[in-house]
Amino acid sequence: MEVKVSGITKQFDRFPALNDVSLDIRSGELIALLGPSGSGKTTLLRLIAGLEQPTQGQIFFGDEDASHRTVQERNVGFVFQHYALFRHMTVADNIAFGLKVRPSASRPPKAEIRRRVSELLDMVHLTGLEKRYPTQLSGGQRQRVALARAVAIEPKVLLLDEPFGALDAKVRKELRRWLREFHDRTGHTTVFVTHDQEEALELADRVVVMSQGKIEQVGTADDVYDTPNSPFVFSFIGESSSLPVTIRDGHVLFQGESIGINEGGTGEGELFFRPEDVVLTDEKDALYGKVTTCRRLAGTRIAEIDIANNGHEPYHLEIEVPLNAAVAVGAELRFRPTRWKVFGKK
């Protein structure tokens, strides 16, 4: 099922939670809505679900305008962060709930419901636990029950609101891998909300990066990490450093001095680069600063560097350096970005 969000604005007491947002979600796609608190990602998910109504704009399920359809009419599956399982029901009854409460005309026969529950128990690796109650399950198992319940009704779209937020790091990582396999097996169009970058980049076919009620960028994990299209995306996704620079005659200058890299255009801008995208150098045209700390991180080292700022608070950067590099605390270190992006100042 394709989903199209067209020109959606949502206001709460005149506060614009979303401002003219448009997004095309392909059938069978796994999409992550990623952003900090207050970015509008959960509001967008709730609008797709029908739990909120747009102030302006339309939401299409396929060719049908679903903007004012109820949750039931949209036939979406929704999984919450805190499971929302019925504690007095067994695992099997929780999974079957959405099928059992359907009107009699559309309710499957009991034998078909049992078959569907058995099939889903196998898919979520909970066969043998169907008679247990939620309190007898681990957090990861409960979340899989919640997902099976959402999928049991054969939803047009599956929506997940921070599905792993209540779980510890190890369980989250295991469930991420499992959810990707589950999605590939079922093929449901799936949208999930997260503030966890690693989760979004690992799981999603495409990531929708949001900030202050707007979409900043939509792309694959490679797109948003390697070619961010705004200062916000560059600074929000992964680790990065930034410095104010001037572009003159194709050369990038920092504090009036060339740093050995070139960029088209002219004028003032902000230079962004990632810790892993630098090379140490002895040449004059480079960035340089004093090493304040140096620590081991897996197969590399992270050097923290202070760069003088004309008597003001120094610029603080982190860069990766080779394990065999002679880096001493208090020493001067010279380096250049090997990959970077300069954004013009507005």
UniProtKB/Swiss-Prot annotation:
User: Which segments cross the bilayer?
Assistant: none
What enzyme category does the UniProt record give? Answer: translocase
EC annotation?
7.3.2.3
Q: Which Pfam families match?
A: ABC_tran, TOBE_3
This chain belongs to the protein called Sulfate/thiosulfate import ATP-binding protein CysA 1
NCBIfam families (alphabetical)? 3a0106s01
ABC transporter domain boundaries? 3-237
The top of its lineage is: Bacteria, Pseudomonadati, Pseudomonadota, Alphaproteobacteria, Hyphomicrobiales
Q: Which domain of life is it from?
A: Bacteria
Originating organism: Agrobacterium fabrum (strain C58 / ATCC 33970)
